Amino acid sequence: MEEKHIETIARGVCISDGKVLLCMPKDRSYSYLPGGHIEFGETGREALVREMKEETGLDATAGELLGVVESSFVQKGERHCEINLIYEMKIESKSEVEVGQRTVQSLESWICFDWVPCDKIDSANLLPPEMKPYCHTGKN
């Protein structure tokens, strides 16, 4: 039997001009906060900064830990369990992207990023939905 494990993920809330940065798989109808898996030996903040650099080429700063969201779901017929560490996030590379004004370019072919108005977060199908409160103010 394949050993199962709980995935630990660092996610960032970047809010600018009333918009929150979200990530979307190109072949799906949902969104999630940017970030990714924490690798052994790194902190959540380090993982968030690394993932943003890998996925967008942009330098980010991970700030205050805003909260923790647990999630359990089935994807492609397989049960997944994850713990999401949610941090404040700022994008440092303002010369490359006007924060909040235009789409952040993805370096990965299967995802895209977009700035979504905080008051439209309910229509963004954010998963897990327990993350929605952080997208309005950065705080739960």
Predicted regions and their residues:
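Conserved hydrophobic/aromatic beta-strand scaffold that supports enzyme active sites
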Residues: 22, 68, 86-88, 115
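Short connector loops at helix/strand junctions that flank enzyme active sites
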Residues: 7, 15, 33, 60, ...
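Active-site-adjacent beta-strand/loop module that shapes the phosphate/pyrophosphate-binding cleft
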Residues: 73-99
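A short coil-to-beta-strand element that immediately follows conserved catalytic motifs
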Residues: 59-68
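Conserved N-terminal beta-strand and adjoining loop/helix that marks the start
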Residues: 1-20, 88
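NUDIX/MutT-family hydrolases
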Residues: 88, 99-135
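Short loop segments at secondary-structure junctions
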Residues: 17-19, 90-95, 118-120
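Conserved Nudix-box catalytic region and its N-terminal flanking loop in Nudix hydrolases
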Residues: 16-54
